From Swiss-Prot:
Motif 'HIGH' region: chain residues: 58-68
Reactions accelerated catalytically: tRNA(Val) + L-valine + ATP = L-valyl-tRNA(Val) + AMP + diphosphate
Enzyme class label: ligase
EC nos: 6.1.1.9
Name under which the protein is recorded: Valine--tRNA ligase
Ribosomal protein listed as a keyword: no
Gene for this chain: valS
UniProt similarity note: Belongs to the class-I aminoacyl-tRNA synthetase family. ValS type 1 subfamily.
Description of how the protein assembles with itself and partners: Monomer.
InterPro entries given in the database record: aa-tRNA-synth_I_CS (IPR001412), aa-tRNA-synth_Ia (IPR002300), Anticodon_Ia_Val (IPR033705), M/V/L/I-tRNA-synth_anticd-bd (IPR013155), Rossmann-like_a/b/a_fold (IPR014729), tRNA-bd_arm (IPR010978), tRNAsynth_Ia_anticodon-bd (IPR009080), Val-tRNA_synth_C_sf (IPR037118)
Cellular-component GO terms for this entry: cytosol
Keyword Ribosomal protein: no
Lineage, highest ranks first: Bacteria, Bacillati, Cyanobacteriota, Cyanophyceae, Synechococcales
NCBIfam families with a match to the protein in the record: PRK05729.1 (NF004349), valS (TIGR00422)
Amino acid sequence: MVDQPDSENLDHAVDALSKRYDPLGTECRWQKIWEEEGAFHPDPNDEGEPFSVVIPPPNVTGSLHMGHAFNTALIDTIVRFQRLQGKNVLCLPGTDHASIAVQTILEKQLKKEGLTRDELGRSAFLERAWAWKSESGGRIVEQLRRLGYSVDWKRERFTMDTRLSKAVSEAFVRLHQQGLIYRGEYLVNWCPASSSAVSDLEVETKEVDGYLWHFQYPLSKINDSNGIRFLEVATTRPETMLGDVAVAVNPSDSRYSNIVGQTLTLPFLGREIPVIADDHVDMDFGTGCVKVTPAHDPNDFAIGQRHNLRQITVMNKDGTMNAEAGPFEGLDRFEARKAVVKALEQKGLLTKVEPYRHSVPFSDRGKVPIEPLLSTQWFVRMEPMAERCRSHLGKDEPRFYPDRWAKVYRDWLTGIRDWCISRQLWWGHRIPAWFVVSETNNELTDDTPYIVALSEKDALLEAQKKYGTDAVLRQDEDVLDTWFSSGLWPFSTLGWPDKTNADLSRWYPTNTLVTGFDIIFFWVARMTMMAGAFTGKMPFADVYIHGLVRDEQNRKMSKSAGNGIDPLLLIDRYGTDALRFALVKEVAGAGQDIRIDYDRAKDTSATVEAARNFANKLWNATRFALINLGDTTFKETFDELEHNRLELSDQWILSKLSKVNNETAKRYKKYALGEAAKGLYEFAWNDFCDWYLELIKRRLNLGESPSEADLSNRKKSQIVMFKVLRELLVMMHPLMPHLTEELWHGVTGFSNKKLLALQSWPALDKDLIDEDLELSFSELFGAIRLVRNLRAEAGLKPSQRAPVRFVTKNQNLLNLLKKATQDIQALTRANKVEILHPREIFEESSGRSLAGVSGELEVLLPIEGLVDLQALRNRLQKDLSKAENELSILSKRLDNPSFVQKAPEKVIEECRLKLSDAEAQAELVRQRLLGLK
């Protein structure tokens, strides 16, 4: 049963809905009401199937950008729809502590004060970090609130909350107990700017124009070497030659077979290094000789492991050269590069320098070249965890939308390297490991034993058991990679590891993850691996992957490109709902990038403005409905109406309503959100506003003495209009929540305390769908559009009435047109409407007419006596000459063999399309002229 409007408050509702839609005031009001009413604060004991989403936590350092706005619009559309489906929905928000980003900001502040973090001390530094987080970290949250996120702010989480920090320690300890976390020496990506290791995924590879330096190493002894006195190597990083421990050649390379096993003398240091044979070497590249620096190159590290070579680190962690660099000690790595090249040249060992474009890894945060550095770090063994995820993926867990991303995810899980999780920072989750030292010796070595425990108290008890009561503990200085805690996000936020937590029991696993393709491994894979290890389940059923927000030139938005758009500027100008709707409607398909235009000089966007205009359209349509419901007391409901006794236009809009209900629900469920938005837009703007409301105006606006039949028809149209508008607002709510909530309370009466956000999705009545009727009305609307075009061509003024004739062989269409004669007359400003079969058209002349065809309908607009026929003929003759001239030019171009052979296919195709359009236009004008004879 359809709710009835509160008739006593309808007049007030019209007054309450101002003539102009004020998005900012409306949004502010409803966001406050939703929060005060606890609309999005579910109880785990509430009825309804559970549905949960944890939002990707933005960094506390961040400000709202278009990526956030896009992600928010998609997530909120999904969760609001599920709420309307009667689900017990939890959408949980939170923020990430962003170790490197926050620490970088704070260290820049300290630098301005003439301090370093070491001078300030760890405790004071962390006090500053928490103070900064309290003052600035809430900015992104307040900005997210402006987007109308229907999240449970009472359950807001922060990755360094006490509960979440305990979960991080628990996860670390468990993985260590399972042998999946270990401490070892390995080459890591070192960022000298932040003095920290960074993961492979925090490295951005850039193409750089540099040089390839060729130089020689002399053989230590000239024995049986086929006259070879030197071996030539080449590198883009000559400063690393100071750490060389060998030169490798391919074992199949006959040029060097006699000198494998001999030694070379390393310039400047005098160190003797062996010539070794290794299959890794490409004998066809350069001279076929490769310098081996295990402590500064991943490939060389592997060679060193195979040949048991020494590992010599020649750089400090700040990027300067250490004592192993001999005469170059103390130089910055790039200064050392210049100095080494110059010294090689002076010794006559530099043979060639050539320009060389190559890939250089940069720190994503520090923005400086990464230095592969040998370091003792904490690692997670990834392969056992990845294998569990691959097994789940075989069972379609999780499902990816679109499904092509499942392969990308699987590829990431295949051949995976161990994950370096320690970071040389202070802001973050400190590693729960304590080194066992003594009161007299607090220094750490590679052999210093350590204890991994949940707390220092637990660690001390274990240390005393193992090493005696005089054991002294020193906690590891490092913190965990931010992605470690983010990997626990879907279940740590719900109370894990407390298995008795009601939220965890009710809402885990979660239902949907919405995220960008760029962090499938950064975050998605790590969440699935962590969840598999700790819960035995995948953390979400579905993963909806969206694309990027690009500008009108299809460029990725970024600070460096200077083409980013501040969403708050667009929100201030057009409103949150307009921005949200524009973003979702632009999605052509799941995973596709979207484009948003922006005029920087005017702070305007045509795309978002169009969405704002749509909001205005809905606002005005609702005001129209309220004005025409204001004197109504509904004594009957829609369910009591006899469908077959409704006007055909009522039956048509109800068919369209049922169809859009069915299609929209399916699209929302399948994450076809862009298609859902487009379908609702077409229904609301075209079907409901432009056609149905225009069709029923005649029935709503009764004369002074209406008949009982007129009053009955008016009541029916009011009931149908109310039903359609009410259900449209419910279906539109996930996309434009503030606007629809305001209009809902206008339609149902402002005394209605029930929030639209908590209503039920409209029941679907497929029996109302009538495909034949919809097809007939489509023909009718096409004919009406044609009449309007013919009137415009004839130059008729809006006030001028003219007869119109419709001719068709289709009997069903004839019947519809005859029943809709009064509506046609009103919509075409006709003083007379004739509906004829072709055999009837010859019974009397229609005089000089403009004619056209729309589908199965021929339309005649008799205009003799209404316009200057000669002037109209002259204008049409000019149009014909123009079209024929265009035809001639295009035909000659396409008949030219040279053009067809040399022009790009795209240009030729455009020319053919223009020719087709010109032919159609010429034929149309000829028909118009024929009707005027």
